[in-house]
Amino acid sequence: MPKSEIHPKWYPDAKVICNGEVVMTTGSTQPELHVDVWSGNHPFFTGTQKILDTEGRVDRFMKKYGMGSANSATSKEQKEEKDSKK
């Protein structure tokens, strides 16, 4: 049996509120929980997520450290092969 008066009050039907509307109920030590984001309006879960990384990671690395692009290394090899065929 838990000791009396040392545990917080438990609310089995606490309301989770997002943008002024109740989105779900859950158990909590507070009667109302106010949240900014939940799975119903988060871009990842709604399928409206935008991908910000349009360049490849290797290309960004090559540009950052002044090595050109990853494709330039392969194009140099292709040029050498063409020259050797002549």
UniProtKB/Swiss-Prot annotation:
Regions annotated as coiled coil: none
Transmembrane segments: none
Source organism of the structure: Prochlorococcus marinus (strain AS9601)
A cellular component term, taken from the record's GO annotations: ribonucleoprotein complex
Bias type Basic and acidic residues, positions: 76-86
Ranges for region Disordered: 65-86
Similarity field: Belongs to the bacterial ribosomal protein bL31 family. Type A subfamily.
Superkingdom of the organism of origin: Bacteria
Name of this chain's protein: Large ribosomal subunit protein bL31
NCBIfam families for this protein: L31, PRK00019.1, PRK00528.1
Record Gene3D superfamilies: Ribosomal protein L31 (4.10.830.30)
GO term, biological process aspect, one: translation
General function of this protein: Binds the 23S rRNA.
InterPro entries: Ribosomal_bL28/bL31-like_sf (IPR034704), Ribosomal_bL31 (IPR002150), Ribosomal_bL31_A (IPR027491), Ribosomal_bL31_sf (IPR042105)
MF (Gene Ontology): rRNA binding; structural constituent of ribosome
Subunit structure: Part of the 50S ribosomal subunit.
